[in-house]
Structure formats: structure tokens, C-alpha cells
Amino acid sequence: MGVPYVPVIGLVGTDLLKRRDDMVLAPDPFGEGKVTVVAKAMRPDVAVFHVQKADRQGNVSFGYAVEAVILAEASEHVVVTAEEIVDRITEKDAVGAFLPSILVDDVVHAPFGAHPGGLTDRYAPDAEAMKEYVAASRDDASFAAYLDTYVFGVSGHDEYVERYVRKARQPEPVA
């Protein structure tokens, strides 16, 4: 969005400002003497999203909240992985939020790209795989072992899907 800061609701009077150097109190330009908290705007280098559908030009249909579009607008680069690549998506065709191709740097076809999480209207989370992920996240050594197996231990996305999104563990479609 290109703004240097954004107002943040609900933080006036909290001690969070004592611990954060990226938030300050500022005069509310519309509040007649009131103050508001403003936070330095984020400018991520890259935002990566996994979506239900995208087209070859980079137009994207998000099946979830518009906040993802705001993050894409704030980012220097946007990479989208998609369950399905179609010939053309227009804003009228989009289910949920729409991200225009002008904001997208690359689109990658990646079925089950949200695994072990779920994807709205496509598949539910893989409960067993999520339990394993949560357990591995408890300490650095366990998480390093998890990454060695599931990220660095496969040659790419196709091998990951073949090995770990097995028919027996494949999540059921969400109605």
C-alpha cells in the first residue's frame, strides 16, 4: 500500500509501547485532541500464498479473507502456489478475495500445497501430520529433524506429496 505507518486500534493505555520501538502514540488527525497508536508499516520482501485457484497470468482467487490481499499489496514480491491453474480468472469469477496479476511475480502449480494444513473447500487438515508438526515445534532440535525429513529429505513438491500425502492419510474433501 506504500504508507509509512498504520493506525492500530486498542493499544492506547497498554504497556506494549514501552517494549516496542515500531509503535508510538501520535495525534489522531480526526480525533480533536485524542491520540492513537501508529505502527511502522510492514514491507515484506516476499509474500507466499497457497490458494485454491490461479490463472496462468497470475490472477488469483483466494477462498479466504481479504487480509491476504493487503499483505500482497504491502510486499515487494508475491509468489502464489495453487491447487489448480486455469486459463483465466476475472474478479467476477473469484470465490472470496481476488488478487490481480499486476501484484503477482510467479504462480506455481502445487496440489496439496497447504499440507499438512487444510485448504477451504478442498481438503481438511491432516490431523496426524499436524500433531507431528506441533510436537516437532517444541524445540530447535526436534524441528531441525522435522525439516530434515519433510523439507530437505525430499527432492521437491511431487516427492513430498507422493511420500507424505498418502491415500491412507489424505484428508477428506471439505463439503
Each model region followed by its residue ranges:
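Conserved alpha/beta enzyme-core scaffold
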Residues: M1-A175
